[in-house]
Amino acid sequence: MNYIPDWNEELAKKIAKSEFINMTPDHWEIIYIIRNFYLNFNLAPSIRILIKTLEKMKYNKKKCSSRYLLKLFPKNPIKQASKIAGVPKTNDCI
């Protein structure tokens, strides 16, 4: 998927529905973190970098784990979250 410049929450909800994900405030937190990361660095974060970013943002320790992210995005946290966020998926080499 390419970056979607005219991304909005309605589009994100449609994409999430196609991924069988019911968006909650926890999902939106991750989506906006990924979008902000992409806008700052022109790439989506790997799962490792996303977890480090959550830690730096002083998130609850429970939320700073791949297990938590898998509960939100069960197929593949980065792939699904990036798709919903309208940003290209990282190649996970970082």
From Swiss-Prot:
Alphabetized UniProt keyword annotations: Cytoplasm, Transferase, tRNA processing
SUPFAM superfamilies linked: DsrC, the gamma subunit of dissimilatory sulfite reductase (SSF69721)
Cellular compartment(s): Cytoplasm
A GO cellular component entry from the record: cytoplasm
Enzyme class: transferase
UniProt-recorded Gene Ontology molecular function terms: sulfur carrier activity; transferase activity
Gene3D superfamilies (UniProt xref): DsrC-like protein, C-terminal domain
Entry keyword Lyase: no
BP terms from Gene Ontology: tRNA wobble position uridine thiolation
One Pfam family this sequence matches: DsrC
Family: Belongs to the DsrC/TusE family.
EC number, UniProt record: 2.8.1.-
Protein name: Sulfurtransferase TusE
Active site residues of this protein: C93
Function recorded in the entry: Part of a sulfur-relay system required for 2-thiolation of 5-methylaminomethyl-2-thiouridine (mnm(5)s(2)U) at tRNA wobble positions. Could accept sulfur from TusD.
Keyword Cytoplasm: yes
Subunit composition and interactions: Interacts with the TusBCD complex. Interacts with MnmA.
The gene coding this protein: tusE
Organism the protein comes from: Buchnera aphidicola subsp. Baizongia pistaciae (strain Bp)
